[in-house]
């Protein structure tokens, strides 16, 4: 393996440090994205759980004879439909286990319709997937689907939490867009890489200037100066056959010993 030059020896740890910083930046960005996603998941779960608790309380009143069951169901559907999430943008859709929409506050036109054949922008059967989550052993879970943001044409990814409310065997679902998490992640990566590029360029310039100054003072690579010193110590003052000594700048160590 050929010996590294002084410049290479100075730049090698610099490159290593920059790569380590890049790896750390990527790791932190991935961690931040993961935590943001988990926080979004928990918020959706808490929101749907609160609706399920509300339904359970109303169902308990009906079971106690305080309300006729049909009136209790209508009350539960209406009150769940009034719940809001994420500053009013999020809501809960109530669906029967056979994919008939009881109440979708954002799209009341589909209330009462069987949506089993509905597909999202990516071709996924959303309501079938909701029913499958509700019918699972856990009775709840997360799913994703694609839907345009208000006023947008292109679909964006939404994270949803679905849960089967056992009081009247309804499926409840709430969703929130998560493309902002990915956008924030990409923006962080771009900013970090740009900052590291500037830092790397600055440090490389400093390393180059330091190396240039040291090489000018020595008159060449330290290995050449060491070879000259070894020859002098051995009594050889010819200095012939050594590469890198012919252009030693005036005032350098190598130029001085060549006189």
Locate predicted features:
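Membrane-proximal, non-catalytic sensory/regulatory domains of signal-transducing membrane proteins
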Residues: 82-93, 117-167
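Extracytoplasmic/periplasmic sensory segments of membrane signal-transduction proteins
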Residues: 61-105, 125-128
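Extracellular/periplasmic ligand-binding regions of membrane signal-transduction receptors
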Residues: 41, 45-78, 107, 111-113
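Short, hydrophobic beta-strand elements of compact beta-sandwich sensory domains
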Residues: 157-182, 253, 257
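N-terminal membrane-insertion alpha helix
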Residues: 18-42, 58-62, 183-187, 191, ...
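Helix-start (N-cap) segments at beta->loop->alpha junctions
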Residues: 148-152, 174-184, 190
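Extreme N-terminal signal-anchor transmembrane helix of membrane signaling/transducer proteins, especially
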Residues: 4-31, 193-203
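Polar/charged heptad-repeat coiled-coil helices used as signal-transmission/dimerization stalks
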Residues: 4, 34, 38, 49, ...
């Amino acid at each position: 393996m050929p010996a590294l030059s002084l410049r290479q020896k100075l730049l090698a740890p610099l490159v290593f440090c920059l790569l380590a910083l890049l790896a750390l930046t990527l790791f932190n960005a991935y961690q931040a994205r993961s935590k943001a996603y988990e926080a979004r998941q928990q918020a959706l779960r808490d929101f749907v759980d609160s609706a399920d608790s509300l339904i359970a309380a109303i169902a308990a009143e009906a079971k106690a004879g305080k309300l006729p069951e049909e009136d209790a169901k209508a009350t539960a559907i209406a009150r769940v439909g009034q719940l809001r999430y994420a500053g009013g943008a999020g809501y809960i859709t109530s669906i029967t286990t056979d994919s008939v929409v009881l109440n979708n506050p954002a799209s009341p036109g589909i209330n009462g319709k069987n949506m089993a054949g509905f597909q999202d922008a990516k071709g996924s059967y959303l309501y079938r997937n909701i029913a499958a989550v509700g019918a699972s052993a856990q009775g709840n879970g997360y799913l994703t689907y694609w839907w345009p943001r208000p006023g947008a044409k292109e679909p964006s990814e939404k994270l949803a939490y679905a849960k089967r409310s056992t009081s009247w065997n309804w499926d409840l679902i709430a969703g929130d867009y998560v493309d902002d998490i990915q956008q924030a992640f990409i923006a962080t990566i771009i900013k970090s890489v740009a900052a590291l590029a500037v830092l790397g360029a600055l440090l490389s310039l400093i390393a180059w200037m330091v190396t240039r100054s040291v090489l000018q003072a020595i008159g060449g690579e330290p290995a050449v100066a060491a070879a000259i010193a070894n020859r002098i110590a051995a009594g050889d003052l010819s200095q012939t056959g050594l590469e890198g000594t012919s252009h030693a700048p005036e005032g350098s160590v190598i130029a001085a010993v060549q006189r």
